[in-house]
């Protein structure tokens, strides 16, 4: 493409495979597309991030996730997609596997990790994000993340769990050489 040339994209394809879903996630993030982002999430979506001690940093469900990224449904609050003019997102696959349902019984009623009746496709990898506002200020995220996908009743794949690993620099006694943010920190800071 030539400088200044506009690229017109067609609608995102239906997530009929886990790979298409992951491509749609990438596209939703890079294009800051609220509707596409919502379409990749399962209604029972659950996000968690813990620190190195295993303590919960952040946990949120579907509606709060939509508000974090897309803003409030009534338009009274901006989301991350509104705040930043540039959003780079890259996922580098480390491991792909299937969680067999019988191996994941519900530990308690409503357990977001229990899925004894269905198998989930899992993508674990390194995610790098760069978010910049109109002043060039923003956040850089470089973190290991795990996405767990389920096949919905309509035949489309959806993200049902998103689990962020603690930042490796937070686990040891060493000092970080650069300022990096975990995804939970960005979600909470940008939505103040």
What are these regions (language model features)?
Residues 1-31, 39, 50:
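Short, low-complexity N-terminal intrinsically disordered segments enriched in polar/charged residues
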Residues 1-7, 111-192:
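Short beta-strand edge/turn micro-motifs at domain boundaries
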Residues 25-33, 41-45, 69-77:
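Sec/Tat-exported extracytoplasmic proteins
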Residues 41-44, 51, 125-127, 163:
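A mature extracytoplasmic/lumenal domain signature
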Residues 46-58:
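A short gly/proline-enriched turn/hairpin at secondary-structure junctions
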Residues 57-139:
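Surface-exposed, charged secondary-structure patches
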